[in-house]
Amino acid sequence: MAESRKRFLGRAARNPLPVTRDLQLPPTRRDQPAFREQRKQKLKEYLLIRKTVFPYKQENQISRDQKMITSEDRVQEGKKVVKLKTEVADKENIESTVEKNCIPLKAGEVTSSEIHNSKDNVQAVQLLSTRDDLPGQTVTLDPACHHKDNKKMQMTAEKPKQDSNVSKKRVLGYYHGQIVQSKINSFRKLPSVKGESLTTTKKLPTTVSKAMKAQSEPANTVSVKASTTAAATKFADAKPVSTASKDTLVRPPIRSLHSSSHGAAKQGLSRPLANVTVRKGMLDKESHRSEPVVSVVKAGSSQAPSRSIASKDAARTDSSNTRLMVKPKDTDQRRYTIAGASVHRSAQLKDTTAERKAQMTEWRTGKGKGLKRPPHSVVTQAEPKGQSENPVGSFWTTMAEEDEQRLFTEKVNKTISECLNLINEGCPKEEILATLNDLIHNIPDAKKLVKYWICLVRIEPITSPIENIISIYEKAILAGAQPIEEMRHIIIDILTTKSQEKVNLGENIEEAHATKEPIQEVNADANVGSGKPGEENEHHGKVEVYEDDQDNKIKDPDLTTPDSKTEAGCIIRYNVSSTPRLQSMKKMQHDKNSTLKELKFLTPVRRSRRIQDKTSRLPAMLKDHDPSVSSLEQLSELGGDAFVCRPNAALCPLFFETDVAEEE
């Protein structure tokens, strides 16, 4: 349904139905050619005004001191001539045209006007412009704007009057309506520095005179000469109209002022000049305007280009430049004078304090009173000098010490290397010790080198004891020899070589003993063959005695040997113990056999003889509560108890060994 409705609406729009005459609207004025021409004309004028504003802003950036101001009379005549015509046809067709006819200026005419200072002096700022093609221009004026401007001008006109009454140069030390004594003292100059201040003031006569001249000029009128300048950009229809606003009346920078003044002077040589007298109060009012009113003046094609008249700001900026140039010098001079005054004061204070101290010491000495301790000032003054001189002296002394140390180390290294070479060659010990002693006598600091102690260790022969080498190592540590790790490695190497040589010597001695035994056996055989019965009997007697001694030693029971240790170290005993199970069994059999008192286990155990001897000496309280007997015959002493024999598996190997030994 929606698609069909859209299609129906589209067809209705393509083929509109005819409308009756009663429902048709009257034709608008937009379809009329006259109205279209009028709209085109208005659009052209609007675009022209927009185009003229932008070039004027560029022109103000290039030269801000070129401005043009017309008098109050001219403005009033223009307001009388203005005619307002309004035609209101419909809401869509609203037209308002304003025409302004002013007196045209001729090419070589010189304008001169006096602007009087009053409450309702100026209502608008007029700008001159030239046009060749358009016979007239239309512009809109709003009376409300004029009313606001008049009120603002009245408010700003009262401020310059109040400022003129107040003296511009303030009193020395004036701050927030009061005179401060500290500020006066800070600017007051000392007599010792007055000569310098006079010389500086003489150097700046021209700059100060210029500033004073600018201030001494009358505040009512100022004469200014300015050359006429053409617009920066040209259009095919008309030349741009120059405008003035609040932003352009701000003080320009110093560079732009110099450049613009030079440019104006060069252009003034070939262009006519215009002398205009402008009242100063008028310019102050114009500088505070917020909404400028632009007026366009008709001009013919034969007229000269628009003239721009420079305002009072040029003179004001010149005077401000002179002031700016004078102020830095004054401030610099003031700084110098303050610094000089502070130095002079500090010097005077030091002198006075020293004199007072001297007088005090004289008075005390006269009275017989001496200082208990010296003053701190003397100590504090002496210390910095010593500190300042010490670094220089210490630097050169350290340099000399380093040179001496380098020479000593070179000499010591050379002699020690020679000693090591002699040791390797096998030179005698006395000669090497003599050279080392001479070195220590000449250079005592040689003991701090490890190479000296290494030589002493190398001199020690291989057969010497290890204690001598260790003592040398201890002496080197006490002397502070560096690097000690090198000596440690060398001592370890020497000790390892010594141990290896000792092992080799032991093997050689054993071999020597082994060679001696066969020699003795051979000698014994020779003696037996030669028939020496006495010696043989003696030898046999000696052997028999030795054998008898060995038998006695083995048969001695007190000696503990690995073979007899097991027999003498432990004892087999029978432990008698009871358990709750046995007690219950005894109660069951109590009725059958009442003769049995108790039923106990009899277990063979192995006890240490040493522990058994010690426990036998203990009191009865500390002994084992379960009795043990050494044989079965001692069981009768226990009374009418019944015993149950329980074998011990740990003792089976022991019994087996004993049985085997008995059988053998």
Curated annotation (Swiss-Prot):
Transmembrane segments: none annotated. This is Cytoskeleton-associated protein 2. The gene is Ckap2. It comes from the Eukaryota. The lineage of its organism: Eukaryota, Metazoa, Chordata, Craniata, Vertebrata. Pfam families: CKAP2_C (PF15297). GO terms for biological process: apoptotic process; mitotic cytokinesis; negative regulation of microtubule depolymerization; positive regulation of transcription by RNA polymerase II. It is found in: Cytoplasm, Cytoskeleton; Cytoplasm, Cytoskeleton, Spindle; Cytoplasm, Cytoskeleton, Spindle pole. The modification Phosphoserine is found at S186, S577, S584. The keyword Phosphoprotein applies. Residues 160-319 are annotated as: Association with alpha- and beta-tubulin. Residues 1-38, 254-273, 283-328, 366-393, 512-545 are annotated as: Disordered. Residues 300-309 have a biased composition (Polar residues). GO terms for cellular component: centrosome; ciliary basal body; cytoplasm; microtubule; microtubule cytoskeleton; mitotic spindle; nucleolus; spindle pole. Induction: By constitutively activated RET proteins. By p53/TP53. Associates with alpha- and beta-tubulins. Its main location: cytoplasm. Keywords: Apoptosis, Cell cycle, Cytoplasm, Cytoskeleton, Microtubule, Phosphoprotein. Belongs to the CKAP2 family. Residues 28-38, 533-545 have a biased composition (Basic and acidic residues). The modification Phosphothreonine is found at T561, T579. Residues 366-375 have a biased composition (Basic residues). Possesses microtubule stabilizing properties. Involved in regulating aneuploidy, cell cycling, and cell death in a p53-dependent manner. The keyword Nucleotidyltransferase does not apply.
